[in-house]
Amino acid sequence: MNPLGQIPVLMDDGFVLPDAQAILVYLAAKYDSTEAWYSKDPKLQGRITQWLAFADSITGSCSAARLHDKLGFKLNIEQARKEGHQNLRLLDDHLVENKIVGKDWLVLNRPTIADIACFPYVALAEEGGISLNDYPAARSWINRFKKLPQFIVMPGIPPLHGMKNNEGEFFNQEGLCFS
């Protein structure tokens, strides 16, 4: 189905599209008439696209380390973890800078597809042996994400390693807090 031989792949009315980031752009451009997730402003599109590309870097590091630890993929785990920490430092620093100017998300004052693209790899980094302890802004960003009204934990994913939110509460499979 996917000419690149990868997942994910989207089929929409006979249109086949591979690549997670391309799928996010397509879905937002086609179905989000409010521009809540993907702006029509070229400057904002550029910023969003910058973070979509960054999500690919996180895939090659944090997600790769997780594939190694969870599924036994053969790769240079030390290099993947090193790059994962470098990527998390960049993300954390950016989130700190954004917080200073009143933004809680990667590009705007609300989540965009840029946040969606980066979130799963950051949230699951610890499953690849990459601790989030040194990245408080990233941890806060994850917790903000989990508090979104539409947030649903993906089936089969543990409650994000029992990670606590800023109030010291854990999230269960339904995304609800419990002590």
Regions found by a protein language model. Give the residues of each.
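Hydrophobic alpha-helical bundle segments that form small-molecule/ligand-binding pockets
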Residues: 91-107
